[in-house]
Amino acid sequence: MLHHNQMVLMGLLNMLKISIQERQFVYSWICSLLSKELTQDQLAHYQRGDFDSLFAFLKELGFTEQTEQLIATLRPMEFQQLELAADFAHTFLLEGNISAIPYMSAYLQGEELGVALNLVDQWMTHYQLGVNREQNEPSDHVSVLLAILIRLIGEQPFHVQQDFAQKALLNWLPEFVRKANNTSCETKFYAMLCNLFLAFMTEDFAV
C-alpha cells in the first residue's frame, strides 16, 4: 500500500481520487474537443455509443447533471455536423464581445497575466512543446495549456500540477465558461462541454 507522501508525489491524492491515467484521459478528451470542431466520423462514434463508458465514468464521479446536458446536445438532428461546426466558430472564433475567446490573455491582465505566461513558457521549454502552427494556436490557447497540464499530471507532484492549474487556468476559466454559455448557438454542445470542463477541473484541484 502506498504511503501518504508517495501518493502526493505520484499525483494520486487529487480530490476526485482517480488515477493519473484517468485524469489524463479526461483532460485529453476535453482538449481534443476544444481544439477543433467534430468531424462527421467523430460525431458518429458518439451516436453509436462509443463514448458511453466515459459518460458513465463521469456520472460516477458526480458530474451527472453536466454529463446529461452534454449528451442531450448530441441527439441526432438534421445537418448536425454542420451545425456543430458553426457552433464551434460562434463559441470560440468570433470577436471577444460575441465569443468565448479560448486564450488566457483575453481574460487576465497585468502581473497576473505575466506570471501565468512565464509559467507557461517555463513548462513549454521544459517539455520542448511547440504551438500548433497548422491551427495557428498561440501558447496561451486553452488546448496548449491543457497539453502542459496533461504532461504535469503524468510527471510532476500534485502541488506542481495545482500551481499550474490555479495560475494558468482556473483563474480565468469561470469567465470563459460564462461567455460560452451566453453565445447564440443551435446545439449548445460546446457550452455544455465547457460547463463539464470547469466542474471537473474545479473538483480535481479543489484545495
Curated annotation (Swiss-Prot):
One of its GO terms (cellular component) is cytoplasm. Its main location: cytoplasm. It holds the Pfam family Nitrate_red_del. One of its GO terms (biological process) is protein complex oligomerization. It comes from the Bacteria. It is found in: Cytoplasm. This is Chaperone protein TorD. Involved in the biogenesis of TorA. Acts on TorA before the insertion of the molybdenum cofactor and, as a result, probably favors a conformation of the apoenzyme that is competent for acquiring the cofactor. NCBIfam families: PRK04976.1. The keyword ATP-binding does not apply. It comes from Aggregatibacter aphrophilus (strain NJ8700) (Haemophilus aphrophilus). InterPro entries: Chaperone_TorD, DMSO/NO3_reduct_chaperone, HscB_C_sf, TorD-like_sf, TorD/DmsD_chaperones. Belongs to the TorD/DmsD family. TorD subfamily. Keywords: Chaperone, Cytoplasm.
